[in-house]
A protein has these predicted regions:
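An alpha-helix initiation/capping motif
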Residues: 44-45, 82
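A generic structural signal for short hydrophobic patches within well-formed alpha-helices
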Residues: 10, 47, 124-125
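Short, well-structured N-terminal submotif of metal-dependent ribonuclease cores
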Residues: 1-42, 54-68
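Short, flexible helix/strand-to-coil boundary loops that buttress conserved ligand/catalytic motifs
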Residues: 14, 54, 92, 128-131
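Conserved N-terminal glycine/acidic-rich loop preference
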Residues: 66-69, 74-86, 96, 125-136
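Acidic, PIN/NYN-like endoribonuclease modules and their adjacent C-terminal/linker elements
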Residues: 2, 105-136
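Active-site neighborhoods of divalent-metal-dependent phosphate/nucleic-acid chemistry enzymes
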Residues: 75-120
């Protein structure tokens, strides 16, 4: 199983925003117990979203924490290629997701059926084929 992270989940974890960070950590632990060989995946959009606030605030320490996560050798990257963008457009039309969310959903679907989308946004559940775990 490949766990695809939406930006909010990782931002809560890396930045340690409580009580959200503890909740996300606990839910990820539960998912990991159910899928012990789980790998992590992200999109380039996710990379951008996670870096914006630390860069805007000149927060080198937080940026370094994100960069440490993004340089993990076991991390699976989903690039924003033509197939992803075309699928995102269809998802946006069918399900009314905002463009960034449609891009995330389309990116996750590139991973095949053995994926979990970890997000705090329940709107992803509207997308057929997405295996969503809503992080509360």
């Amino acid at each position: 199983v490949i766990a695809f992270f939406d930006a909010s989940a990782l931002i809560y974890l890396i930045e340690g925003k409580e009580p959200f960070a503890s909740r996300v950590r606990n839910q990820i632990s539960e998912v990991t117990q159910a899928h012990p060989n789980m790998r992590a995946a992200v999109s380039r959009l996710f990379w951008l979203e996670c870096r914006v606030d630390p860069m805007k605030n000149n927060d080198a320490a937080t940026l370094a924490l994100f960069d440490a996560f993004f340089t993990r050798p076991d991390l699976v990257w989903v690039e924003l290629n033509q197939a992803v963008v075309e699928l995102a457009a269809a998802i946006r039309v069918r399900h009314g997701l905002r463009t960034p969310d449609a891009l995330q959903a389309a990116s996750c679907l590139q991973l095949g059926s053995r994926h979990l989308l970890l997000s705090s946004d329940a709107a992803f559940q509207r997308v057929h084929g997405l295996n969503v775990t809503v992080l509360s």
